[in-house]
Amino acid sequence: ASSGRKVLYATAEDTWKSATPRFDLQSRLKQKADILGLDWNKIRENLFVLDTVAYPELRDWNTFAETYRYVAEKEKIELAIIDSVTVLEAYRGALKYRVMELARYNQVHGITALYVNQRSTEAWDSYDMAGGIGLAHNLDGTIIIDYGRVYWQDQQVDLAVNRGEFVRIARVLDCRMCNFERRRIRVDITTDGFLRTTEPLPKTEETKA
């Protein structure tokens, strides 16, 4: 949004603007923009928010989809962020079909979309996610970010830590766009709320002409 691109942000986890603005999503994003040296006024100009917390009627799938399409076409949206995809779930088991329907719309209209999801079980570092693993296979790429206790040998090898330690990881599950490594990357959340790697990222092999 700071570069002039139109962004649509749909939130189901947090309200955009509350009576105590110190804690609302808008204030936190502004703080992060300031840290990164980005123009908040430019971001506000190009950022459009569907707040399903403040406006629960948007949790109805038909209402959400109609509003989403209207904003996307009227404002010529280039990037959409759905946080999280539970906003699309009308009933248990429907999530995958909602995401697929929205993904098809985005593809037709040239919109790049990021879908935030949660794991569906207590087991960490797994492929279990709300909507099932089939949900990930219908998208161009899936990245897992998780936190838990290291137990298995392959976790110890990937992360270079001892069994029993608690770590936060990032891991590419699938990607149709480029080559990738499946191994876990250790990450951490900084005091200013950003996700940072705690080790150098692996270099992908360059394709020789």
Descriptions of predicted regions:
Residues 10, 37-41, 77-78, 107-110, ...:
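Short, surface-exposed, polar/charged, turn-prone segments marking secondary-structure boundaries
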Residues 21-23, 93-94, 156-157:
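Short amphipathic alpha-helical segments
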Residues 22-24, 101-102, 128, 191:
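A generic membrane alpha-helix/interface feature
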Residues 28-31, 66-71, 99-101, 135-136, ...:
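Short, low-complexity, polar/charged sequence segments that are solvent-exposed and flexible
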Residues 112-198, 202-204:
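Phosphate-binding/switch region of NTP-binding enzymes
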